[in-house]
Amino acid sequence: MRTSQYLLSTLKETPADAEVISHQLMLRAGMIRKLASGLYTWLPTGVRVLKKVENIVREEMNNAGAIEVSMPVVQPADLWQESGRWEQYGPELLRFVDRGERPFVLGPTHEEVITDLIRNELSSYKQLPLNFYQIQTKFRDEVRPRFGVMRSREFLMKDAYSFHTSQESLQETYDAMYAAYSKIFSRMGLDFRAVQADTGSIGGSASHEFQVLAQSGEDDVVFSDTSDYAANIELAEAIAPKEPRAAATQEMTLVDTPNAKTIAELVEQFNLPIEKTVKTLLVKAVEGSSFPLVALLVRGDHELNEVKAEKLPQVASPLTFATEEEIRAVVNAGPGSLGPVNMPIPVVIDRTVAAMSDFAAGANIDGKHYFGINWDRDVATPEIADIRNVVAGDPSPDGQGTLLIKRGIEVGHIFQLGTKYSEALKASVQGEDGRNQILTMGCYGIGVTRVVAAAIEQNYDERGIVWPDAIAPFQVAILPMNMHKSFRVQELAEKLYSELRAQGIEVLLDDRKERPGVMFADMELIGIPHTIVLGDRNLDNDDIEYKYRRNGEKQLIKTGDIVEYLVKQIKG
């Protein structure tokens, strides 16, 4: 490709609305342009990267035995009503009616569509197992699209769905998809972790996320410093303290705390160790309960894990925090003065709180706290559960080492769905015993557009993108200095361009009438891994300057050796 016949579209300045580095660099490198909130046009450079990612995904899915299909973006509403997700999905599901007043949705995912297909196409257990995938556009009407293509409304996704007559068969495909995903992200040159995860709104019994480690990530990824244990923070178990609860050394005292409405204010004003404080959060109880609210207690320096809390049988789903008005109607005190003593509603405490003694908490009286609270002396020990987020330094749940926490960007997710959708849509086949058998399902997703952004978040420097070789838009950039004034430079540039292309190497020849500084800046911004610079001065010595983008190292290579050298660098 020649720049004179290509839409380069690089920008010198960073657009003001681009927050994360991937969004900034994708705009500056001429990969994308914003059309509307959460909607982007992909320019030629972006499409080249996107296709590289797609091809790797497609190759590994095919290698794992999956079969490619293509399903409509537009889906009839009755399928979503049949599965029960019409109400569950909420406003992210874009709903509309056609000219015949028939309701439809823009598909954010395709469980319903593929299950409908299978229930009409398969009849016997002999046709299974099968695993279908597609690489196709999805739409989710995000309330706050942000971070460019990282959280856009329209995006490209690889989604796969497998069908089985046994859990053993599902596990085999699940393991194959786990291995395929690991190969996909390894081939792309990404630093990632596969972590245990919550199944969320899609449902199911088992789940793993594939997280690319990056400071800008929205998720906390938890892993052991000595073992293979890894989990999303939503799922990571917080182990109960091994040490027995210390004996009480203080009497419980009612203390006036009119200006301490938060744990931070309480700690600062009364010089308390934060580890000796407890915060109380009130959430709505499950429908039909004899109490409207449930009190959840965690240590002052810990955070409530909302996913764990929502799974408590007495807590309403989705988890909903009580308003001040609702709290006062039950406790007759404000949110900053709540605690376990004389709490008139059910209480659930975290494992760490259960091990505390001589602690401080609200007195359920405005402007007052109890200091020196002890379980079983001042208040009966209530129900104990794991309801907090783990923190760095906690023991690993597998008993090996301690936990580390890093930020991650979720780029892939695999689920064992079980029979959730096949039961709802009555997808069954004739089993080996001749009776109808409901199918067991798995689903496996990769955010193709998100992978591109995640790769940049992990691979950049002050000059621009530093692409892993496997997904770079071009492999080699040829920069001929003053080629329009030097016949020798022009002739060699054309010769090398032809020879490299003949070797199957993707080349960008910068044949613009631009200053060298502009040419260098653009190629580094775009992130092409290998650059060769042709100039009269070096050619006097039969030399060509070679530069590797990742480490910035330069070296002179003889003109006659440069093609062989590049082929070796790229193809090994």
Curated annotation (Swiss-Prot):
UniProt keyword annotation of Ligase present: yes
GO cellular component, one term: cytosol
GO molecular function, one term: proline-tRNA ligase activity
Localization: Cytoplasm
A family per Pfam: HGTP_anticodon
EC supergroup of this enzyme: ligase
CDD domains named in the record: ProRS-INS, ProRS_anticodon_short, ProRS_core_prok
Subunit description: Homodimer.
Family: Belongs to the class-II aminoacyl-tRNA synthetase family. ProS type 1 subfamily.
Protein's UniProt name: Proline--tRNA ligase
Lineage, top ranks: Bacteria, Pseudomonadati, Pseudomonadota, Gammaproteobacteria, Enterobacterales
GN (gene name): proS
